[in-house]
Amino acid sequence: MHNASDIQSALVPMVIEQTAKGERSFDIYSRLLKERIIFLVGQVEEHMANLIVAQLLFLESESPDKDIFLYINSPGGSVTAGMAIYDTMQFIKPNVSTVCIGQAASMGAFLLAGGEKGKRFCLPNSRVMIHQPLGGFQGQASDIAIHAQEILGIKHKLNLMLSEHTGQPLELIERDTDRDNFMSATQAVEYGLVDAVMTKRG
């Protein structure tokens, strides 16, 4: 019985390159990494975050003065996993240009907005969605109260950071993230989540 990850890895295309030493084959994502392109696809969770962080650190060590391009197609996910990626993006020396392909929702939208100002893009038919962090903790009443307090603290911190990245007042961010708030690529530009809609490679 094959699990989903086995099937997924079997479907990743291989690229053959001619080199002075003969042929070399790469999976498509490794080949794109050579071009300083990282794909953030699917749910944001700890394992994926560790891989993204490792790639960011590797590309910084390779060329600290060259931009990194982070392509995002994600419904969001774990706040702590997302913050590991976000903090690394801010920490490393290269500028991280973010590009939304498909969708950037929840933590995906936050990471999109966290790219280098002036280098954050959406493709024309992509969608962006912002909202408040979700809580699903179960347990004793006192523990639930502790987790509720933690979520409120995280919500306020994320809103402050989103306000900083978009240039929107905190009160507006608080109101607009109270419920799921979907935006087209153009609306995401107007809101300040990204800087431009990219239709053709320049």
From Swiss-Prot:
PROSITE patterns assigned: CLP_PROTEASE_HIS (PS00382), CLP_PROTEASE_SER (PS00381)
Localization: Cytoplasm
Family note: Belongs to the peptidase S14 family.
Entry EC no(s): 3.4.21.92
Keywords: Cytoplasm, Hydrolase, Protease, Serine protease
Catalysed reactions, as listed in the record: Hydrolysis of proteins to small peptides in the presence of ATP and magnesium. alpha-casein is the usual test substrate. In the absence of ATP, only oligopeptides shorter than five residues are hydrolyzed (such as succinyl-Leu-Tyr-|-NHMec, and Leu-Tyr-Leu-|-Tyr-Trp, in which cleavage of the -Tyr-|-Leu- and -Tyr-|-Trp bonds also occurs)
Coiled coil: none
Active-site residues, record numbering mapped to chain: 106 (nucleophile), 131
Cellular compartments per GO CC: cytoplasm; endopeptidase Clp complex
Gene3D superfamilies: 2-enoyl-CoA Hydratase, Chain A, domain 1 (3.90.226.10)
Protein name: ATP-dependent Clp protease proteolytic subunit
Subunit structure: Fourteen ClpP subunits assemble into 2 heptameric rings which stack back to back to give a disk-like structure with a central cavity, resembling the structure of eukaryotic proteasomes.
Function: Cleaves peptides in various proteins in a process that requires ATP hydrolysis. Has a chymotrypsin-like activity. Plays a major role in the degradation of misfolded proteins.
Organism whose genome encodes this protein: Shewanella sp. (strain MR-4)
Any one of the GO BP annotations: protein quality control for misfolded or incompletely synthesized proteins
